[in-house]
UniProtKB/Swiss-Prot annotation:
Keywords: Actin-binding, Endosome, Membrane, Protein transport, Transport. Residues 392-407 have a biased composition (Basic and acidic residues). The gene is washc1. It comes from Danio rerio. GO terms for molecular function: actin binding; alpha-tubulin binding; gamma-tubulin binding. This is WASH complex subunit 1.
């Protein structure tokens, strides 16, 4: 028996359905019908079995998820009634596999029963004689695909014709390196040069279209306003947090743990905040460097001038500086009222301790510079430029110290007076011109000796202005008289 089957395949279809051919003998047709029904029964049984297995598998997975949910609910219910604090640790990763399982069809691994060999059955009946008339009659009823679209005789194809079926992309539809569709309009075109040579019929039928006018933005040189793009970036903001005034401890509350206390300092929060200055790490300090730096800092602090300009530090050679001169320098001013007298005494006595502390500081600094000290000593022995008579540095510094104390006393006594302010301004200008301002006094002990320029000599020659103390005292006597 020769069995002819026709198979219809679809995408993803595993099984093939046999079709029974016409014009078969009765016995042969019965055998093919029986085989087709048995084949259909086997296919349906296999399909329903696979569907049932898939449903059962999904049901088991759903049951496992339900059991996990019930277990979690039971644990939550158990924790609810407890008054003890419970720590719950959550996994850092989402409980899912790194790679999701791909979908698999239920027909994977299925075998088509038609591919199996079947026993051959011998047909006893004879073949029918061929009838040409019956064959011709059957041909009359066969479906024939007829193109019902009528084509006019006047219509002429302008391009290459209809699109082929094997066109997969737009690049294969258009001419290379151009935008010309040759199936719609055929042109002679060099893709590299860009020159177009059209056919004679195309030139006759095509109408010349003038280009459109340029837009107003080009003809009138107008510029369109550029719209600023909106910013959709998320900026976290804490916003307004309501202040709730509640007591720190509420006893006997249901469902609240009573064996755990929280402190106010819980560490950095998740909200945006200004970085604190305490977050800067402290660098470790070394022993020797720290001692040296601390010593140098103390020296700088001692040498730094306070708001009232202090006297310059004395040279390292003299160590027996008499303390009484500050007291004697404060005595000459006229006797003011008792309260200013206490202020004067305190001002006069206050510079004494810094002088003692400042004495020792330069001696420590000058010790290592033996070469410079020997050079200065040789210059002093030589007599300077032209063997000029050098004044004693100690005397000059004592005179300047007395002069500054007199200025301070005058400023404190006649504070707020127009003449005293003018006197102070003139004194400051003289110091600025001579280069002996308060900024250059605390630099080093050798600064006054080295600043022997022309301006310094001129400022020494100019006598200082008289202090306005006597005039103020005379005015007071006149008012009392």
């Amino acid at each position: 028996m020769v069995r002819m089957t026709q198979k219809r395949y679809l995408e993803g279809q595993v099984y093939s359905v046999p079709l029974i051919q016409p014009d078969l003998r009765r016995e042969e047709a019965v055998h093919q019908i029986t085989d087709a029904l048995q084949y259909l029964e086997m296919i349906s049984t296999d399909i329903f079995t696979r569907v049932s297995e898939s449903v059962e598998k999904n049901r088991a997975h759903l049951q496992s998820v339900t059991d996990r949910i019930k277990l979690a609910q039971a644990r939550v219910q158990k924790i609810k009634g407890s008054k003890k604090a419970t720590k719950v640790f959550s996994s850092a990763k989402y409980p899912a596999p790194e790679k999701l399982q791909d979908y698999s069809s239920i027909f994977t691994g299925a075998v088509d029963p038609a591919s199996q060999k079947r026993p051959r059955i011998k047909v006893q009946s004879k073949l029918r004689p061929l009838d040409d008339k019956a064959q011709q009659e059957k041909l009359m009823y066969l479906p024939v695909c007829v193109n019902t679209k009528k084509r006019s005789e006047d219509e002429t194809e302008e391009g290459l014709g209809s699109l082929p079926r094997n066109v997969n992309s737009v690049s294969s539809l258009l001419l290379f390196n151009t935008t010309e569709n040759l199936y719609k309009k055929y042109v002679f075109l060099d893709p590299l040069a860009g020159a177009v040579t059209k056919t004679h019929t195309t030139l006759e039928t095509e109408k010349e279209d003038k280009p459109f006018d340029a837009p107003l933005s080009i003809t009138k040189r107008e510029q369109l306003e550029r719209q600023t793009a909106e910013n959709y970036f998320y900026v976290p903001d804490l916003g307004q947090v309501p202040e709730i005034d509640v007591p720190s401890y509420l006893p006997d509350l249901p469902g609240i743990a009573d064996d755990l206390m929280y402190s106010a300092d819980l560490g950095p929060g998740f909200a945006p905040s200004v970085p604190a200055s305490n977050s800067i790490p402290e660098l470790p300090s070394f022993g020797t460097d720290h001692d040296e730096s601390s010593g140098s800092d103390s020296q700088f602090k001692l040498e730094a001038p306070p708001p009232p300009p202090p006297p310059p530090p004395p040279p390292p050679e003299p160590t027996h500086v008499p303390v009484p001169p500050p007291g004697t320098s404060a005595a000459p001013p006229p006797p003011p009222p008792p309260p200013p007298m206490t202020a004067d005494n305190t001002d006069a006595s206050s510079p004494a301790p810094p002088t003692g502390t400042v004495k020792g500081a330069p001696s420590e600094v000058v010790q290592p510079s033996n070469g410079r000290a020997s050079l200065l000593e040789s210059i002093r022995n030589a007599g300077g430029i032209g063997k000029a008579n050098l004044r004693n540095v100690k005397e000059r510094k004592m005179e300047k110290k007395k002069q500054k104390e007199q200025e301070q006393v005058g400023a404190t006594v006649s504070g707020g007076d127009l003449m005293s302010d003018l006197f102070n301004k003139l004194a400051m200008r003289r110091k600025g011109i001579s280069g002996k301002g308060p900024a250059g006094q605390g630099d080093s002990s050798e600064a006054p000796a080295s600043s022997g320029g022309a301006f310094a000599r001129m400022s020494d020659v100019i006598p200082p202005l008289p202090a306005p103390q006597q005039s103020a005292a005379d005015d007071e006597d006149d008012w009392e008289a």
